[in-house]
Amino acid sequence: MSFVHLQVKSSYSFLQSTINIKEYVRYIKSLGLSTCAITDHQVLHGAYEFYQICKQEEVKPVIGMSVDVYLNQEQRPLTFYLYAKDFKGYQSLVNLSNLIQLEKERVTLKHILQSEQVIPVVSFYDTFVEELIYLDDQHKLNEIVDTFNQLQHFYVKVDPITSSKNLVTEWFSTRNDLKKRLVLMCDVRYLKVSDRVGFEALYAMHQSTTVSNVRREANVGTHLLTLNEIVEQFGQDWERAQKRSVEVVDQCEMTMPNNGLIFRHIRRRMVYLLMNI
């Protein structure tokens, strides 16, 4: 295997994906793949279900979560994709999710540094960094990249799948310090090409807009590309970035204890939801 999808939202990301977890895992298995990941935004509602189904289907589960992270005094966040190396890493993700959902706090780089056993992947796409690249503000860009040197190890997302994202993707070609960290990721929101229509309707509700407007934003979401489609899309381009997706998941070995510990996060979320009905 030379590629693993590391950016997959499920239907637990409210109105942002049509992906049913059971269908997703079984589809991965039908493609002859042995690993799959989940990265809902700032929530872990589907994590345990995902883990159980993966174990039933004999597919390796990689539990992740996307998080808005604020740097220094910046009021606009970057997106971090965080992957649990093990159960300790999963607990770190739970703590971050609780910090956001229950305590209504912003996640900072300090919180990431304090999170044990997680693998961070930084995304500059659809963030204020695009503006800095456009303005060619090299001083500020260098300052941001230097900030990440506090992390023991991190990767950087590259997503060349749509032309509208060329600004960030082309910037990477000027950054030798980031090239060795690039990992290929695609924003998977639905399983098959035929599911696009349903996703567009769902996402239109999420954005309080029309389906026509969503269709004009061709870069919003994609289906789960097969390995053949990845090869057709990129050929030998980004080959190392593709392989780094496997490098990431090779560091993840999740085993959840078969006891009540796993339900603490679920119970807290249920109480929170009931109090806010």
State each model region's role.
Residues M1-S11, N20, Y24-T35, V59, ...:
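Conserved active-site carboxylates
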Residues E57-V59, L178-K180:
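Helix C-cap/helix->beta junction micro-motif
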Residues V4, A37, L182-L184:
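Residue-level marker for buried hydrophobic side chains located in beta-strands
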Residues R181-S194:
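Short acidic/histidine-rich active-site segments
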Residues F50, Y134-L135, E143-T147, V168-L178:
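Short, aromatic/basic amphipathic alpha-helical patches
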Residues Q42, D68, R189:
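Catalytic metal-binding/acid-base residues of hydrolase active sites
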Residues I21, V43-I53, S164-W171:
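Active-site-adjacent beta->alpha loops and helix N-cap segments on the catalytic face
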